[in-house]
């Protein structure tokens, strides 16, 4: 059935990052009829790599997550507020990893290690700002976070470190193999909450040019192994099976095209409890 056209309003904010002193763009996509339904509150989904979320012309790879058409073409998905936090460009690899990379083929170069500070920015600056300025359902159950590649890494970390505040995670093509041992040790020490919902996605043909500078081994297998290990460790830690969804997609590459194609399934999985 043909859906009537509707416009989704977007607002832009500049929030100061405490550890850099610089402002970071944070955009907020409002659900349909947000300004009319003034008594209604909404779940919130936070996205990393905000430049890649809305418009393909802004995306580094020329293709976005297509969140706006996803919402318009899938009216069955619960209405939500979408928050897109821009990455720091050249500082992205440092911010999206809580630990230094153990894998690197670049002599004299070390990446990662600022993920804890970035997580504090997201949870102590961005989330409170959103909850204070928008009609959110600010509780854990209705707070979700999505990221891909290194954005998946930081989603995993924040999802564990702040699991008392985040109820849903969308982890796409995590590059956790870059600091696998450190993440595994960290995860072993955490007491997991059984009702956190986690959507895990990985393709069988993952690997891009950046990956090849960081690892000499079988990168495609590393992506698969890392996602499977995460899934296994969540189960071992007590997360209930009905709260986990793992998808391994044959032939899928490390790119926004398959991520955007699988986003509706991720959002539906979140919304089952909304």
Q: In which residue ranges do the predicted regions lie?
A:
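Non-catalytic cap/lid and distal C-terminal segments of serine-dependent acyl enzymes
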Residues: 1-274
């Amino acid at each position: 059935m043909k859906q009537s056209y509707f416009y989704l309003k977007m607002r832009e904010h500049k929030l100061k990052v405490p550890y850099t002193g610089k402002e970071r763009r944070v955009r907020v996509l409002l659900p349909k009829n947000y300004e009319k339904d003034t008594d209604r509150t909404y779940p919130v989904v936070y996205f990393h790599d905000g430049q890649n979320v809305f418009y393909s012309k802004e995306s580094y790879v020329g293709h976005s997550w297509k969140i706006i058409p996803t919402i318009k073409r899938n009216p069955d998905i619960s209405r939500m507020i979408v928050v897109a936090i821009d990455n720091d460009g050249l500082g992205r690899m440092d911010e999206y990893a809580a630990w230094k990379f153990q894998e690197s083929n670049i002599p004299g170069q070390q990446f990662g290690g600022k993920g804890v500070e970035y997580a504090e920015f997201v949870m102590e600056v961005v989330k409170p700002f959103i909850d204070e300025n928008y009609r959110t359902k600010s509780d854990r159950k209705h707070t979700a976070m999505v990221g891909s590649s290194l954005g998946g890494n930081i989603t995993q970390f924040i999802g564990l470190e702040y699991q008392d505040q985040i109820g849903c995670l969308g982890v796409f093509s995590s590059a956790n193999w870059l600091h696998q041992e450190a993440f595994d040790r960290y995860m072993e020490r955490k007491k997991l909450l059984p009702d956190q919902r986690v959507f895990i996605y990985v393709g069988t043909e993952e690997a891009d040019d950046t990956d090849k500078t960081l690892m000499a081994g079988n990168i495609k297998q590393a992506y698969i192994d890392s996602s499977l290990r995460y899934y296994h460790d969540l189960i071992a830690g007590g997360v209930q099976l009905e709260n986990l969804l793992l998808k391994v997609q044959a032939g899928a590459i490390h790119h926004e095209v398959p991520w955007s194609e699988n986003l509706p399934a991720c959002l539906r999985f979140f919304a089952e409890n909304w």
